[in-house]
């Protein structure tokens, strides 16, 4: 797959897909779920993502029961909570700290899928 992203300093918004340098030093693609100053909580029983006490309506994936935050996490003034769209197999803000804007290298605006070839 080929991913095209913009390095412009546009405003980051919820549901933006971003290219970032994660806390583990790897470059990853994640979706912004929580914005600076918001409180994020993931319910242990249902996997429901809550932002400032309200259920987040998601079109991009669901968080599985058992992948949660033990406590509500309030994001700092330059922190973003990110999740992978493949929640079942993603290392993201559930595993490492929220990311700062300096870790976000660009907003993805197009993904070109490679064709699978039969071999």
Question: Where in this protein do the model-derived segments appear?
Answer:
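Feature for secretory/organellar precursors and membrane-associated catalytic proteins
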Residues: 1-72
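A structural signal for short, hydrophobic beta-strand segments that form beta-sheets
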Residues: 32, 39, 78, 104-108
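Phosphate/adenylate-binding glycine loop and adjacent helical scaffold
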Residues: 84
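Active-site environment of divalent metal-dependent phosphoester hydrolases
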Residues: 89-90
